[in-house]
Swiss-Prot record:
Assembly with partners or alone: F-type ATPases have 2 components, F(1) - the catalytic core - and F(0) - the membrane proton channel. F(1) has five subunits: alpha(3), beta(3), gamma(1), delta(1), epsilon(1). F(0) has three main subunits: a(1), b(2) and c(10-14). The alpha and beta chains form an alternating ring which encloses part of the gamma chain. F(1) is attached to F(0) by a central stalk formed by the gamma and epsilon chains, while a peripheral stalk is formed by the delta and b chains.
InterPro entries (UniProt xref): ATP_synth_OSCP/delta_N_sf, ATPase_OSCP/d_CS, ATPase_OSCP/dsu
Principal location class: membrane
Entry protein name: ATP synthase subunit delta
Gene name of the encoded protein: atpH
Pfam family, one: OSCP
Record flagged with keyword Metal-binding: no
Keyword Phosphoprotein listed: no
SUPFAM superfamilies per the UniProt record, alphabetical: N-terminal domain of the delta subunit of the F1F0-ATP synthase (SSF47928)
UniProt keyword terms in alphabetical order: ATP synthesis, Cell inner membrane, Cell membrane, CF(1), Hydrogen ion transport, Ion transport, Membrane, Transport
Subcellular location: Cell inner membrane
Function recorded in the entry: F(1)F(0) ATP synthase produces ATP from ADP in the presence of a proton or sodium gradient. F-type ATPases consist of two structural domains, F(1) containing the extramembraneous catalytic core and F(0) containing the membrane proton channel, linked together by a central stalk and a peripheral stalk. During catalysis, ATP synthesis in the catalytic domain of F(1) is coupled via a rotary mechanism of the central stalk subunits to proton translocation.
Length: 186
């Protein structure tokens, strides 16, 4: 397995571990990580691609043909492209987001980094991302890789999950706290 204390499980964990070990053996972790990030960005920006990935209506051949076109246009080649094709052929493309998350965790562990899941109401600019990374690095003593998710329902602020710790400074949570306090008071 990848590293003894890195916990990945289930289908996504097995596929992520296979991708990580292949990338490590080929000494191309950085290139594979960049391609994985590029594919994740495509998923985040393209609802049609998400539909293709998640829908059981499409056959493996239809998914494969469409995926080939997407990968070619995005410039994703080599290990990552072949890996995504294997996911497609094995009818596991629906799990690609979990595979990406597990792969990123394996890479972070390998590099001695920590991974934080961050939920924000609006996308963060580079200055804010750098400030958040610096703040989390001061807490953990490690470089921190961010998995940022945009969720407008938190209204403002952010939610950070780092390992077993979570800090919720979202406006939604603060408003709910005020609401409960007012109910108790009156």
């Amino acid at each position: 397995m990848a590293t003894d204390d890195t916990s990945v499980s289930g289908v996504a964990g097995r596929y992520a571990t296979a991708l990580f070990e292949l990338a490590r053996d080929q000494k191309s972790i950085d290139a594979v990580r960049a391609d994985v990030d590029k594919f994740a960005a495509l998923l985040a920006d393209n609802p049609d691609l998400v539909r293709l990935v998640r829908s059981p209506v499409f056959t493996a051949q239809e998914q494969g043909k469409a995926l080939d076109a997407v990968l070619t246009k995005a410039g994703i080649t080599g290990i990552t492209a072949n890996f995504l094709k294997v996911l497609t052929a094995n009818r596991r493309l629906f799990a690609v987001n979990d595979v990406i998350r597990a792969f990123r965790a394996l890479v972070a562990k390998f590099r001695g980094e920590a991974t934080a899941d961050v939920t924000v109401a609006e996308p963060l600019n580079d200055k804010n991302l750098d400030a958040l990374k610096a703040s989390l690095k001061s807490v953990t003593g490690k470089d921190v890789d961010l998995n940022v998710k945009v969720d407008p329902s938190i209204i403002g602020g952010l939610i950070v999950k780092l390992g077993s710790r979570m800090v919720d400074s979202s406006l939604r949570t603060k408003l709910n706290s005020i609401k409960h306090a007012m109910k108790e008071a009156g």
